[in-house]
């Protein structure tokens, strides 16, 4: 097709390092440089990305021991690719490599490893992060990623708890759902990470469940996570989700 031919032509114009940069997209660092080589000029969004990266680089250079910045990070399979292996050992080995690399960069907590949200919407731009649409397969593989990372030193962090399965309106959407569906579909991956993987950190989601924000949901974070499953680690909210800090702390 014309589209295949178009992108095939683009790839022939890129060096291998540039191809990797486009695929990885680390804060736009390598990607923006690649775009500049194949386009006449950057648009406003691309210029903003480049400016943000400059600020980030400067901050990291000044605070190298506090904010580690990977200079040549490895490129690892996405959750969807790992899920397609149906192979616990392969997932464990991949996670071990991630853990070793993060430890080398003095990273204490590897956020979002793993993402166990199910594949429910093909239009979800982040669906590739999760393992599968199948809660059973997810519950088999995710604990292996947790163990692989934590055996190397850094703490794993499983996200987004819970029922966070679309990007559209993800900061405000209210998921109206019964407890049976939660426990049979959306909880198994998290429960396996807690009870089998011994994950030390959980990230709460932006969305609400039956009217109650996940980041400030006592039933979710205390009754289910801590009392039912025995979790004794710490919960972090997704970025800015705990807008009522007192309620969030009280919720667990």
Which residues does each PLM region occupy?
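Glycoside hydrolase catalytic-domain context in secreted enzymes
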Residues: 1-252
